[in-house]
Amino acid sequence: MQHEFWHQRWQENRIGFHQFTPSPLLVDYFNELGLKTSARIFVPLSGKTLDISWLLQQGYHVVAIELSQIAVTSLIEQLVEDFDIQFESSEKNNLIHYHHPQIDIFVGDFFDLSKEQLGQVDAIFDRAALIALPDDIRQDYVQHLIEISGAASQFLISYQYDAGSHEGPPFSVNAEEIKQLYAEAYDIRLLKEQLVDASQNKGNHPKSTLWILTAKF
């Protein structure tokens, strides 16, 4: 999963993808999933996103996985500051696990995370995972995500720009590919599509799209 690439990005602090406020789409539309506030939300490839703090503030439980220890250390420092959370840590199956009753954080390769380790989740919040992966990995990512989560409902944000205008990441994933990746397991609803400030993002004519995915079975 391009370990060296992402480790280097974090070591060099080249994290322009990190947002310093919670995702506006998350804040405005997450209630479309119709979840109880005690629901457990999975955040794959989480980085140190402030979206996790927002989810916790709403009363949700969170489980996240991130490859970079640097990112997770920063995330934990922020959570300790914001919520006075103290974590217990353990290690199993190549993954470091930080546990608190309201949040679990795993450090390591997403593909090493098992269904048993993840536990039951009610929904998946994917703002930056799918679009961080090149096309030769995305199908495997989606399949593993479905397997370990039991096809939990998804709040998925994709990103699209003109072909050839940027190499990625973030990678451009269009509506046709979203359907190819998810249609077998999910009913797919396009909820919101918006243009993105090109000066702040990669690629020509960038736009973000919010999808709600609901399991067919």
UniProtKB/Swiss-Prot annotation:
The keyword Cytoplasm is assigned to this record: yes
Binding positions (S-adenosyl-L-methionine): 10, 45, 66, 127
Enzyme type, top EC level: transferase
Gene Ontology MF, one: thiopurine S-methyltransferase activity
Subcellular location: Cytoplasm
InterPro entries with a match to the protein in the record: SAM-dependent_MTases_sf, Thiopur_S-MeTfrase_Se/Te_detox, Thiopurine_S-MeTrfase, TPMT
Alphabetically ordered keywords of this record: Cytoplasm, Methyltransferase, S-adenosyl-L-methionine, Transferase
UniProt catalytic activity: S-adenosyl-L-methionine + a thiopurine = S-adenosyl-L-homocysteine + a thiopurine S-methylether
GO CC terms in record: cytoplasm
Origin superkingdom: Bacteria
Major localization class: cytoplasm
UniProt-listed Pfam families: TPMT
CDD domains: AdoMet_MTases
A Gene Ontology biological process term: methylation
Entry-linked SUPFAM superfamilies: S-adenosyl-L-methionine-dependent methyltransferases
EC number from the UniProt entry: 2.1.1.67
Family to which the UniProt record says this protein belongs: Belongs to the class I-like SAM-binding methyltransferase superfamily. TPMT family.
Alphabetical list of NCBIfam families matching this protein: PRK13255.1, TMPT_Se_Te
Stated name of the protein: Thiopurine S-methyltransferase
Record organism: Acinetobacter baylyi (strain ATCC 33305 / BD413 / ADP1)
